[in-house]
Curated annotation (Swiss-Prot):
Residues 74-83 have a biased composition (Polar residues). This is UPF0729 protein AAEL015238. The lineage of its organism: Eukaryota, Metazoa, Ecdysozoa, Arthropoda, Hexapoda. InterPro entries: UPF0729_C18orf32-like. PANTHER family: UPF0729 PROTEIN C18ORF32 (PTHR13456:SF0). Pfam families: DUF4512 (PF14975). Belongs to the UPF0729 family. Residues 69-97 are annotated as: Disordered.
Length: 97
């Protein structure tokens, strides 16, 4: 049989997180940035995507071109798993030498 605190505490935490906390955070949210008058500062850049590709060029290209080529060729049912498996085997052979 389960002890009473082991059953009651998770139920209370669920009720807090699901029903009570959203109402409390509407009126008291310590993580919101406020100015000296107490008004909430809304940062418009937080909702935008931080990386933009302009003129067809992305500043952050894909790191591993081998994975991209395997995915583009469409060989195998899961190209990522195949690429990871072959890389792991190559690393193991290097370590054993």
């Amino acid at each position: 049989m389960v002890c009473v605190p082991c059953f009651i505490i998770p139920v209370l935490l669920f009720l807090w997180h699901r029903f009570i906390q959203p109402y409390v955070l509407r009126f008291w949210n310590p993580w919101e940035k406020k100015d000296k008058d107490g008004n909430v500062i809304k940062d418009g850049s937080s909702t935008e995507f931080p990386f933009q590709c302009k003129g067809g060029v992305c500043p952050f290209p894909v790191k591993d071109k081998a994975k991209q080529e395997v995915a583009a060729s469409g060989s195998g049912s899961n190209g990522t798993a195949t690429a990871v498996g072959s890389e792991g085997e190559a690393e193991e052979t290097k370590k054993s030498q």
